[in-house]
Amino acid sequence: MPAPTIYYIRHGETAWNAEGRFQGSQDIPLNELGRRQAADAGGILADLCAHDGRSESALTFVASPLERARSTMELVRDVLKLPVGDYAVDDRLREIGYGRWEGSTLAQMQASDPEIFAARLRDKWSVSPPDGESYASVQARMSDWYNQLTTDTVAVAHGGTARALMVVLGVETSDSAADLAIEQGAVYVFSEGGLRKYS
């Protein structure tokens, strides 16, 4: 049986994204640009489904429990003319936890915890922020999530979970994925043919 295709969308921009602040588990709403990015992603997904001759309603839809991901999902579904609230929420898709660093910029992180910051620069995948979560642990929960998929799925989540999924599927290594930019307003398609980004 072929592996399910995943249409992966990172949530749209928030005020903290615009300010360079790390959100992690904090529930920051979309800003105006973020809402436009979500609608753009919905349009891209509609075009991909039309090109592939597939019905959007036949896909499974699942989002991170955080508001910025759920709002993005609802805007995507609105563009697709599907009932906006008819999707699943899965806690495994939540963003990497930044612990004490949530709400901070990189400069503030370095100033508050210089030794941990330096260690994380050397090994971002395995070193956790203070009271936070490592990418390795996010990779474990994303592997668990992926391994239970049985149908082609639209997932709306975060940059950190996208990087972890890329490592789970062998598209990137932990070294190459750790600092990879994940675009907002794009659709990342994971399939047996690898990964393609549409924006």
Segments from the language model and where they lie:
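Active-site-proximal alpha-helix that buttresses catalytic centers in soluble enzyme cores
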Residues: 7, 13-82, 133
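Short active-site segment of divalent metal-dependent hydrolases/proteases
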Residues: 14, 161-162
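Alpha-helix C-terminal capping segments
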Residues: 143-151, 189-190
